[in-house]
From Swiss-Prot:
Matching PROSITE patterns: RF_PROK_I
Protein name: Peptide chain release factor 2
MF (Gene Ontology): translation release factor activity, codon specific
NCBIfam families: prfB (TIGR00020)
Positions of post-translational N5-methylglutamine modification: 251
Changes after translation: Methylated by PrmC. Methylation increases the termination efficiency of RF2.
Length: 373
């Protein structure tokens, strides 16, 4: 590849990065940083713990975005200088270094560009993720627990704070269901492409005959409700039941009735929370989950009205979107984007970025196709 080719590649990368800087508005991010730093330094910040956690979480996220953008700009400028040096000295060794830098830059800028595709009404929200075991008995419950760990590890890899609201354990092993939040801006826009039915194929560790088992689990991603959403639920529309928290195998893990189940009478939606020690805390968490489900229901109804379709609130649960095959071969494959890997262990350890980024791009293409119909 010639010097001119490298120069053209760098020019294209510079154009892409300038577009990203414009869309993400780095000047606004810097202004947000100053505002959040001022809020974080307030002496009474921790008088309201929920507010304090929100401020520190947002500040961490904004700092991360600014660092990514400034690092990319610095790397691009340094590579341009390196290319000029290679041209001046006619040094093939330096050109090899330039080629490697351009390859790395292209990958990093491509990953950052995905953020510019998150422009939906609720994409900037924090995310509430619900996982439910589906068909497959104990293997499905075990799969649900594997998915919970996978998403928590993904968040941990990125330094995103999470909070587990509810884990309902199955009798033999695994989880019937789990609900948690990812507390950073744009978590909903990022993770919403994970909604759907996930499928696991493996030799069951719970089958004495060592037979292959197919099991399913559903993932539902909702935007966290904010005050501006005005999701107010009258007390007479809710039935609240309390019970003792249970752990693996159905054993009781609390001597008081601290777990809470809320039923929304008009819709039949049921939410539970048992991870907090206090009944009041569990009720508050369960109410947040219920509000998120009602907001999603409202969003689906509005979308269906625009499209002239009948709302199917459970539709996403029936959409099989990814297979995890551990036997007779090893592969994870997204059925929408064709993204795949031969390393299921790394995926279950939270290496999801390639799948999520492909999902976001696929969703954007679907939206554009729909607009053109």
């Amino acid at each position: 590849m010639t010097d001119a080719d490298f120069a053209e590649q760098l020019k294209d990368l510079d154009t892409t990065l300038r577009n990203i800087e414009s869309v993400l508005d780095i000047d606004r991010l810097r202004a947000d940083k100053a505002r959040l730093e001022e809020a974080a330094s307030a002496p009474d910040l921790w008088d309201d713990q929920a507010r304090a956690q929100q401020v520190t979480s947002q500040l961490s996220y904004v700092n991360g975005e600014i660092t990514k953008l400034t690092d990319l700009r610095s790397r691009l400028d340094d590579t341009q200088v390196l290319l000029e040096l290679a041209e001046a000295e006619s040094d093939p060794g330096v050109l090899t270094e330039v080629a490697a830098e351009i390859t790395g830059l292209a990958k990093s800028i491509d990953e950052m560009e995905v953020r510019t595709l998150l422009s939906g009404e609720y994409d900037s929200r924090e995310a509430l993720v619900a996982i439910r075991a589906g068909a497959g008995g104990v293997d499905a419950a075990d799969f649900a627990e594997m998915l919970l760990r996978m998403y928590l590890r993904w968040a941990e890899r990125h330094g995103y704070p999470t909070e587990v609201y509810e884990t309902s354990y199955a009798e033999e092993a695994g989880l019937k269901s789990a609900t948690f939040t990812v507390k950073v801006p744009y978590a909903y826009g990022t993770l919403s492409v994970e909604s759907g039915t996930h499928r696991l194929v493996r030799i069951s560790p719970f089958d004495n005959q060592g037979r292959r088992q197919t099991s399913f689990a559903g993932v539902e991603v909702l935007p966290v409700v904010e005050q501006t959403d005005h999701i107010d639920i009258p007390e007479n529309e809710m039935r609240t039941d309390v019970y003792r928290s249970s752990g693996p195998g159905g054993q009781s893990v609390n001597t008081t009735d601290s777990a809470v189940r809320i039923t929304h009478i008009p819709t039949g939606i049921v939410v539970t929370c048992q991870n907090e020690k206090s009944q009041l805390q569990n009720k508050a968490s369960a109410l947040r989950v219920l509000q998120a489900r009602l907001l999603e229901r409202k969003r689906q109804e509005e979308q269906a009205k625009l499209q002239g379709l009948k709302t199917d609130a459970a539709g996403s649960w029936g959409d099989q979107m990814r297979s995890y095959v551990l036997h007779p071969y090893q592969m994870v494959k997204d059925l929408r984007t064709e993204q795949e890997t031969g390393s299921p262990s790394s995926v279950f350890d939270g290496e999801l970025d390639a799948f999520i980024e492909a999902g976001i791009r696929w969703r954007k293409q679907q939206q554009l196709s729909g607009d053109n119909v």
